[in-house]
Amino acid sequence: MYGFEALTFNIHGGYLEAIVRGHRAGLLTTADYNNLCQCENLDDIKMHLSATKYGSYLQNEPSPLHTTTIVEKCTLKLVDDYKHMLCQATEPMSTFLEYIRYGHMIDNVVLIVTGTLHERDVQELIEKCHPLGMFDSIATLAVAQNMRELYRLVLVDTPLAPYFSECLTSEDLDDMNIEIMRNTLYKAYLEDFYKFCQKLGGATAEIMSDLLAFEADRRAVNITINSIGTELTREDRKKLYSNFGLLYPYGHEELAICEDIDQVRGVMEKYPPYQAIFSKMSYGESQMLDKAFYEEEVRRLCLAFEQQFHYAVFFAYMRLREQEIRNLMWISECVAQNQKSRIHDSVVYMF
């Protein structure tokens, strides 16, 4: 359904919406994936990708290729598309596009802090960071000993600063506290993004509410499964769940007390949209859960393109391109390690 935004959307957003729909048309199809799965080596993959949007990014790469090179160059395509859209955008679209970066910024902070804890080289860690999540003071994250220092020395001048209000403790950074920090930051980020989209109203609010609610629910399930058998209490677990989504609040109450994967399954099967996801798994199995969630996410992201005059297409395109890069990384790894029998295990088809 279109509201009054359809009358004026094209003044500032029409050009960029046309651009992003053009980018979407360049995503790999099932036929492309079938061809890639037949490749015998990474040079074959490069040859198949030469006819796609990635061609110009890979054409000057010498043999022998490595999986990391393919992923790096494909990610560069994503970053270039994003930067082009951002520099053309006006408010409030530019703020919406900035929100898309924040998840990568959180991941980069966690990567640097965790790596430093395990005495990894800072420069090596920075090279592994996602380019969309980079910020000026990222290298100085290594000096922080606890959450307060992390905030005071580094993050106070970044867009993540407001999300740190829940994690400002003097406890030393260890693996458990870093994971709690990651999930607390993500909770604050998702809730903030959700509120921003609600303020925008119209089709943007409607479609983004569905996409962000799905993300919040998926994170709630993953937090529950990953915290089974750890020292995280039920109350601590519940604090990490986002305060919106299909599971909020009653599903959260039930997830907080789950003690194994089958109990999680029992909770999720009460919610029809998630029933199909869990029906694909055997009892006691969680290995295929990530793929099932990714497939459902891709289905919802593709539906975002069925309507016009809204910002959700930008979010959907970025997520679909990220999924495509995950697919290419998996295919490349399977080919490089001669594990072609497993090549279809993690590929999520889009079109």
UniProtKB/Swiss-Prot annotation:
GO terms for cellular component: cytosol; Golgi apparatus; plant-type vacuole; plasma membrane; plasmodesma; proton-transporting V-type ATPase, V0 domain; vacuolar membrane; vacuole
Keyword tags: Hydrogen ion transport, Ion transport, Membrane, Transport, Vacuole
Localization: Vacuole membrane
Main location: membrane
Key word Transport present: yes
Topology in the lipid bilayer: Peripheral membrane protein
InterPro entries in the cross-refs: ATPase_csu/dsu_sf, ATPase_V0-cplx_csu/dsu, ATPase_V0-cplx_dsu, V-type_ATPase_csu/dsu, V-type_ATPase_csu/dsu_dom_3
Pfam families according to UniProt: vATP-synt_AC39 (PF01992)
Gene3D superfamilies, alphabetized: ATP synthase (C/AC39) subunit, domain 3, V-type ATP synthase subunit C domain
GO MF term (any one): proton-transporting ATPase activity, rotational mechanism
Family: Belongs to the V-ATPase V0D/AC39 subunit family.
Function noted in UniProt: Subunit of the integral membrane V0 complex of vacuolar ATPase. Vacuolar ATPase is responsible for acidifying a variety of intracellular compartments in eukaryotic cells, thus providing most of the energy required for transport processes in the vacuolar system.
Subunit organization: V-ATPase is a heteromultimeric enzyme composed of a peripheral catalytic V1 complex (components A to H) attached to an integral membrane V0 proton pore complex (components: a, c, c'', d and e).
The protein, known as: V-type proton ATPase subunit d1
Organism from which the protein derives: Arabidopsis thaliana (Mouse-ear cress)
Lineage: Eukaryota, Viridiplantae, Streptophyta, Embryophyta, Tracheophyta
The encoding gene: VHA-d1
